[in-house]
Amino acid sequence: MQLEFIAHATFLLRLDSGRSIVIDPYKAHEFNGRFDYPTFAPLCDFAVITHEHIDHAWLGDLRGNPVVVRQAWCDRELRISSVFAYHDAFGGTKFGGYVLMKVIEADGQRLCHLGDVGEPLSDAQIAALGHCDVAIVPIGGFYTIDAHAAHALATRLAARTTIPCHFKTPLCTLPSADATPFLRLAGTYTHLPHATYPIDSLPPGIVLLDDAFNP
């Protein structure tokens, strides 16, 4: 399985068979110019959605008539499951309900994407996510857990590689922090340029990936 960071919380996975999976596709040029990523219109086989906000669940630009997975999917090659969490620390009342964090298993690899998780996770939720080769964790705060909560969560998940997402960039000036507070807490991390990476080639620890649009 290969992974490419597109932008915000959107990732593109490519399986060894050639099938492709988009996680949390966004709608371009939203929020009155504060979310100014360009259109992303991949040809894909699956669109995996953690929750129904426009920066995570826009299907209008996807090509190839993908299967949309909101809860679960299983076939001979691919297994996708969901773990419930709230979008905020107030039982989902502040930022629109819940997210279904995703676990994707294929090609002998296991990846979790936590969507816009906004609450500390229980031991039961951590156990349901299980041990992952890669954990994709939001870090920006305001709409999601903040840097301190994200660092604590990454430590508890203990994935081989943790990839931060959902933070402020030159093209996303929504009210969240940039990656700096999280990276300071991490202490050591690897910064990689935008590319498609085999999951088993990613270094261990915190890995900051450049997205497709921010230099």
Segments and roles (model prediction):
Residues 45, 133, 160:
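Conserved acidic residues
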Residues 4, 96, 157, 161-215:
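Binuclear metal-ion centers of metallo-dependent hydrolases, dominated by the metallo-beta-lactamase
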Residues 1-17, 27, 34, 79-83, ...:
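Zn-dependent metallo-beta-lactamase
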Residues 90-157:
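Active-site-proximal loop/helix segments of hydrolase catalytic cores
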Residues 28-32, 52-58, 119-122, 142-146, ...:
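Active-site environment of divalent metal-dependent phosphoester hydrolases
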Residues 59-108, 185-203, 209-210:
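Metallo-beta-lactamase
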Residues 12-48, 56-70, 84-97, 117-128:
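Pre-active-site segment of Zn-dependent metallo-hydrolases
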